[in-house]
Amino acid sequence: LAVILDYAVSNGLCEDSVVYRDLFDTKIMGLITPRPSNVIGKFNSLYEKSPKCATDFYYKLSQDSNYIRRYRIKNDLKWITKTEYGDIDITINLSKPEKDPKAIAAALKMKSASYPKCLLCKENEGYAGRVNHPARQNHRIIPMVLGGDDFYLQYSPYVYYNEHCIVFNSEHTPMKIDRSAFEKLLDFIELFPHYFIGSNADLP
């Protein structure tokens, strides 16, 4: 993929910056990543064997499609600090690309956009991206029902810890901690007993 990117840059097909290279290589990977329906079908089929088989497949796909950029993740800094309260895992995430000056200038000239509404909305799946919103043509999400509501599972592209996944509502709604939130967390554990799950505090 790096060779293709270098060729694209040298032949004027892509600007030479992290943002534009990411947009370009994600478009390429989107063409060879299996369709969402195929990914969901394979996931569900493997889930019948075991939930872990299903998530193993999905996590590997998320890496092989370059949605999770392994070559960047390996640069993250991680260590354990001993404290009087116990060991604390500390991570410094270096895999999230920094904006370059060209991309910042281009973003300032763009009309404001509200699609997708945020980086987690289901509409990100397959989204072509722009200089101020990452491309997601290689992104696939897994539907599930929690507490009677439609949710999706995805892995974080920035991997703060092993198999770092995110569960999000099918609708763009504020996060809320209440009884139903705990019911949904427990539903998730029943579906994926090899994982643990938590929830952020109430956030807008």
Walk through the language-model features, giving the residues of each.
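Active-site microenvironments that recognize anionic phosphate/pyrophosphate groups
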Residues: 1-174
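Short C-terminal domain-edge/linker segments immediately following a structured domain
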Residues: 119-125, 183-185, 198-199
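Short acidic (Asp/Glu) patches
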Residues: 135-138, 182, 200-201
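A broadly tuned preference for mixed-charge, low-complexity surface segments
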Residues: 146, 203-204
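Helical scaffold of the NTase/Pol beta-like nucleotidyltransferase catalytic core
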Residues: 170-195
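A short glycine-rich, hydrophobically flanked beta-strand micro-motif that places a catalytic Asp/Glu
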Residues: 195-203
